[in-house]
Amino acid sequence: VYMSGXGKPPDVTGGEAHVAGKTVTYTXNPGYIMIGGAXLTYETGSLGGLPDIDDGKSFYGLLGKVPNRVGNSVTYSSQHGYYLLGKKTLTRLNHVGLPGGKPSALDNGMATIVXRXAIYKGNHGFYLVLPAGYPGTPGTPGPRGGPGDPGMPGEPGVGFPGVPGFPGSNGRNGMNGGYPGPKGEDGDIGPMGGKGEPGDPGLPGEYGV
């Protein structure tokens, strides 16, 4: 990071590094401390630029390489049937690269995001994560689920026996007896009795006069 007042970084090959693998090294003036990496390596394309991307639907991408000089800009345009979401023009502000990410293209008829999120590698050893696209439309609710399995039977209760009830009131006396019953039939003749005992001897007779 170049701090204001720390002196102008030295020019290297006219301020640009056009050969892949070439490294630019910065040092701070006396009394200042370097913040961030002191070396920037030119990898592919322009130093700090974004790669060319053309998905065939959204936008044409970059025509050529990203300008390497501070103050230069890149402008995007969408194809017929699409319109851009985000900044159409990106301007290089410092040696790190273009600010923000490329704009997305939205289909006029389908209202869906065409561009995908992408990760670009910065030439200073860090990774820039571009923002993801807008959220899509909610999906339709799924079918209603079937009934669940029957639950397990509950455990038996543990209540104690109830208190005995109080005695009931005395009942009323019953009515008097009913009508007299009919006369019973005659009984059977009993068996013959046994032989009687001999009688006592008679008294002596009296003499006649």
UniProtKB/Swiss-Prot annotation:
Region annotation (Disordered) maps to: 138-209
Q: Which PANTHER family match?
A: COL_CUTICLE_N DOMAIN-CONTAINING PROTEIN-RELATED, COLLAGEN ALPHA
**What is any one GO biological process for this UniProt entry?**
extracellular matrix organization
Annotated region (Triple-helical region) at 130-209
The record's region (Nonhelical region) falls at 1-129
* Native source organism of the sequence: Scyliorhinus canicula (Small-spotted catshark)
Q: Sorted alphabetically, which keywords does the UniProt record give?
A: Collagen, Repeat
**Organism's domain of life?**
Eukaryota
Query: Its Gene Ontology molecular function terms?
Result: extracellular matrix structural constituent conferring tensile strength
| CC annotations in GO | collagen trimer; extracellular matrix; extracellular space
Physiological role = Major component of the egg case wall which is secreted by the oviduct. The egg case combines mechanical strength and toughness with high permeability to small molecules and ions.
Query: Spans of biased composition, class Gly residues?
Result: 142-162
The signal sequence is none
Family annotation (InterPro entries):
Collagen_superfamily
Q: What is this protein called?
A: Egg case collagen
